[in-house]
């Protein structure tokens, strides 16, 4: 299978917040911007396995396949790769997670998430999430 991107976010339905990742300035792709946790597939992974691995690497937490909800998937023409986006319902506190990559991460209220410096694909996919939630 060709390399693909798999990523996503945690969502707390009680507080209506999403957990997003702030990229550091060492990356060539969207430095210092907020986006989803995730990355490129490795070996023979399927998308959900890539998402689980990336969350483990970036937040230090384990997800079960059954907790993961597919949001959307499509061809990212700009990068010529398929993009799979997932989310997980969670009320985990920030203190229970450990940043493994990037500059920061935080719970952000949906009411003002679009005031953050988000990557273009994060904006598009969060809009899809909001359309499906309402």
Specify the residue positions occupied by each region the protein language model found:
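Residues that flank catalytic or metal-binding motifs in active/ligand-binding sites
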Residues: 4-6, 32, 82, 101
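Conserved Nudix-box catalytic region and its N-terminal flanking loop in Nudix hydrolases
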Residues: 17-57
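Nudix hydrolase/Nudix homology domain
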Residues: 27, 31, 98-134
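Short histidine/acidic/glycine/proline-rich micro-motifs that form metal-
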Residues: 40-42, 75-76, 112-114
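A short coil-to-beta-strand element that immediately follows conserved catalytic motifs
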Residues: 62-71
